[in-house]
């Protein structure tokens, strides 16, 4: 069982399927765990480096169990986050990938000797995603490939939601 430190996270459809375990609300007041069911949890989960993630980390450390940081997956939804349920979640038991101030499971994987070459199943999945034109929010129109192939300079605009923790924890600022 996983104790979840946010009612918003508990509202995510199929959360138990994403986490492969039952979930229960880890009701925390003044730093104390008040949930009878959560007292039996083998891990506590919160949202990245937000307050719920910090609560999960603190409770897990006191109880000697794993802390799981959750974040939108790289294929987020069909539509914007406010209007659509997630299609994937990142579950990290080390840190969270966008926080450059501490390690994450992704960082550890990249630094390991483990092969990162996709197997046949991974190659097939990637081919299906490309053929289906799957993107993070799946709301954009078709790419204008002929326009992209025209000679001349191109500008890539990279942006993030104002105030998103990935900017500050990734070493950036609103000016960069």
Question: Would you name each region that the model predicts?
Answer:
Residues 1-176:
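Catalytic-core helical/loop segments in enzymes performing group transfer/polymerization on anionic/lipid-linked
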